[in-house]
Amino acid sequence: MSAHCMLTGARPGFGNRISHSHRRTSRRFDPNIQTKRYWLPSENRHVRLRLSTKGIRTVDSIGVEAAVARIRARGVRI
């Protein structure tokens, strides 16, 4: 599965791992993706969302209905 947030669109960042002697090798900074299950009252069912921790706080703030509407507006099928 891809490491990106369905709500915020957070994706991995890239950079360098730097050793003590300053040799550089590529590395990935993955977002903290969590799978959360929310109850969607309008559809009378649960939905499983892959969200970053910032996305989880956004759902807590705006509500699951508005969050699902934003995700669907991005073209993601739930």
UniProtKB/Swiss-Prot annotation:
GO annotations of cellular component type:
ribonucleoprotein complex; ribosome
Report the InterPro entries cross-referenced here. Answer: Ribosomal_bL28, Ribosomal_bL28/bL31-like_sf, Ribosomal_bL28_bact-type, Ribosomal_bL28_sf
UniProtKB keywords: Ribonucleoprotein, Ribosomal protein
Task: Output the Gene Ontology terms for molecular function.
Answer: structural constituent of ribosome
**Which SUPFAM superfamilies does the record associate with it?**
L28p-like
Note the SS bond partners.
Answer: none
Entry's Gene Ontology BP terms = translation
Indicate the family of this protein. Belongs to the bacterial ribosomal protein bL28 family.
Q: Which NCBIfam families match?
A: L28
* Identification of the protein by name: Large ribosomal subunit protein bL28B
